[in-house]
């Protein structure tokens, strides 16, 4: 049995630290990406091209879709023929740690499609569960096998200085690690991520089908500095959820004992929902979660991705689009803050952060 990454001197850097590259997966699942994913593929392409200006992009695409992906992207990416069940690189890719000598270690968590038999979103996730180890192998990186501990990359944020941010709603959900206590889960995170402290936010974003991943509700933008999804509408269920998170963050400190500067990032003013026009585009397999008209989607500007040269921020043709860009521009003065039309990614169930996974320098 290998020593824990913490004992070996590894830690998880912050996303805003320098990247070697970014991992993404070409979107092809008919039950996630309506109408053959045409609009999603355009959105993915814009994201990939923006990230590629400052770092390498590795794209997992199966042979059957290679020529299609190449028609969109040409030689802008490194193509890898690794099979997947869907395109959520954040959740299926490895969490890559570094040590002070610059060596890397890829953590391979168990993946069960956000809840397994309890409330998972699809039944066959065998390929997804292998993505982390296969990608690490392609990069010739050593792997720390954290299985059978179930975790998705979207469920954790790191400040690179010993603090991990999570939500109770996700990590304590019955579909993840029901046989472990909160204390055992926390200890596994600290040992596997080389961290000193876990901060447990109560909630994520209302109706987020990942059981409320942290990456949709809060994110580190610097040491002791976070953004938090917010609404002033007291009738929106999100209000009480964000308020509980804010109250916790206001009384917490990071691993170094510093209090947080908290920036409130509004959610879109208009609720994002699945429409009647969207529905015919989805083709589901047996046992797969199905969309319905009027279903509220978990839209949040917090689901941005910090690349080397840019911060990619979801846009929803909403009055708060520009507000979010302005707030994040102040948080990231040294990066270009780029708005990306993102409804077509949201229709798949996530957003820009969910389809990207950083590979630290």
Swiss-Prot record:
It catalyses: agmatine + H2O = N-carbamoylputrescine + NH4(+). Signal peptide: none annotated. Gene3D superfamilies: L-arginine/glycine Amidinotransferase, Chain A (3.75.10.10). InterPro entries: Agmatine_deiminase, Peptidyl-Arg-deiminase_porph. It holds the Pfam family PAD_porph. Coiled coil: none annotated. Its EC number is 3.5.3.12. It is an enzyme of class 3 (hydrolase). GO terms for molecular function: agmatine deiminase activity; protein-arginine deiminase activity. Belongs to the agmatine deiminase family. NCBIfam families: agmatine_aguA (TIGR03380), PRK13551.1 (NF010070). PANTHER family: AGMATINE DEIMINASE-RELATED (PTHR31377:SF0). This is Putative agmatine deiminase. It comes from Streptococcus pneumoniae (strain Hungary19A-6).
């Amino acid at each position: 049995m290998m020593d824990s990454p913490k004992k070996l001197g590894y830690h998880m850097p912050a996303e805003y630290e320098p990247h070697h590259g970014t991992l993404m997966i070409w979107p092809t699942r008919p039950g996630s990406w309506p109408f053959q994913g045409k609009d999603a593929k355009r959105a993915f392409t814009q994201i990939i091209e923006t990230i590629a200006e400052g770092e390498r992009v590795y794209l997992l695409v199966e042979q059957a879709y290679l020529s299609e992906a190449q028609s969109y992207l040409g030689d802008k990416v490194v193509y890898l023929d690794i099979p997947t069940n869907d395109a959520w690189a954040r959740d299926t890719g490895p969490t890559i740690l570094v040590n002070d000598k610059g060596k890397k270690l890829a953590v391979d968590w168990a993946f069960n499609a956000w809840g397994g038999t309890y409330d998972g979103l699809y039944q066959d996730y065998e390929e997804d569960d292998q993505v982390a180890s296969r990608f690490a192998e392609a990069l010739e990186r050593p792997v720390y096998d954290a299985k059978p501990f179930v975790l998705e990359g979207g469920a954790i944020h790191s400040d690179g200085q010993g603090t991990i941010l999570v939500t109770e709603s996700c990590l304590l959900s019955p579909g993840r690690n029901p046989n472990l206590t909160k204390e055992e889960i926390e200890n596994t995170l600290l040992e596997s991520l080389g961290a000193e402290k876990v901060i447990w936010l109560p909630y994520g974003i209302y109706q987020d089908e990942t059981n409320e991943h942290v990456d949709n509700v809060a994110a580190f933008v610097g040491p002791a500095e976070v953004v938090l999804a917010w609404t002033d509408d007291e009738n929106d269920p999100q209000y009480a959820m964000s308020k509980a998170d804010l109250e916790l963050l206001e009384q917490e400190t990071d691993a170094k004992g510093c209090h947080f500067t908290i920036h409130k990032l509004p959610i879109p003013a208009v609720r994002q929902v699945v429409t009647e026009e969207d529905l015919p585009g989805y083709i589901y397999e047996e046992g797969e979660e199905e969309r319905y008209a009027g279903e509220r989607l978990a839209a949040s500007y917090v689901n941005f991705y910090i690349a080397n040269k840019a911060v990619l921020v979801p846009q929803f043709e909403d009055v708060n689009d520009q507000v979010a860009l302005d707030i994040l521009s102040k948080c990231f003065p040294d990066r270009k803050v780029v708005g990306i039309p993102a409804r077509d990614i949201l229709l798949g169930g996530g957003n820009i952060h969910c389809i990207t996974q950083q590979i630290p320098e």
